[in-house]
């Protein structure tokens, strides 16, 4: 079991890429309080970045786990719909929003993901566990050769020369 530490801040209706609401105000980025912690799971991301928590949960419809994670320097994962069950809801068949883990690093996130993944017969999108441990498979690719593809513009999107050059230098 887990111990509930507390609740963190989210925007009203968990809608928005900036964590602000009239009741609790704005969640500031812990690395620079002039910046946003992102949203909608900005409170969770800020709590993790400051060391207040080891794990945090969130939901993701349009980046609500991923954006605050990247803005606060932590890790957030939007899992496959059905991997982490929802339980009964009015939108049971919707795969748009998912529950997901957030953590300070990939190792912690994989431990939490192992704990969150389960089957729930009240969630029509839920599926049975495969028996795979995300934590135990973290180093699966460490001794394997693999390639990473990169595109400058997907063949259709214009990209500034400065951005293109910075991307190429980063890849090198």
What are these regions (language model features)?
Residues 167-171:
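Short catalytic helix/loop segments, enriched in acidic residues and glycine
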Residues 78-166:
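A short helix-breaking turn/cap at a secondary-structure junction
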Residues 2-116:
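Short glycine/serine-rich loop segments
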């Amino acid at each position: 079991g887990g111990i509930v530490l507390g609740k963190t801040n989210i925007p009203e209706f968990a809608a928005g890429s900036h964590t602000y609401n009239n009741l609790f105000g704005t969640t500031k980025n812990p690395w620079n309080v002039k910046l946003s912690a992102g949203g909608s799971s900005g409170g969770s991301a800020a709590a993790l970045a400051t060391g207040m928590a080891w794990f945090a949960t969130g939901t993701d419809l349009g980046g609500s786990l991923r954006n605050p994670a990247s803005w606060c320097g932590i890790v957030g994962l939007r899992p496959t719909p059905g991997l982490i069950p929802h339980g009964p809801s009015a939108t049971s068949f919707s795969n748009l929003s998912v529950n997901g883990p957030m953590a300070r690093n990939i190792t912690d996130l994989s431990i939490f993901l192992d704990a969150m993944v389960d089957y729930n017969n009240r969630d029509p999108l839920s599926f049975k566990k495969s028996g795979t441990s995300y934590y135990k498979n973290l180093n699966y690719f460490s001794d394997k050769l693999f390639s990473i593809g990169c595109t400058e513009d997907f063949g259709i999107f214009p990209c500034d020369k400065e951005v293109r050059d910075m991307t190429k230098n980063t890849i090198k």
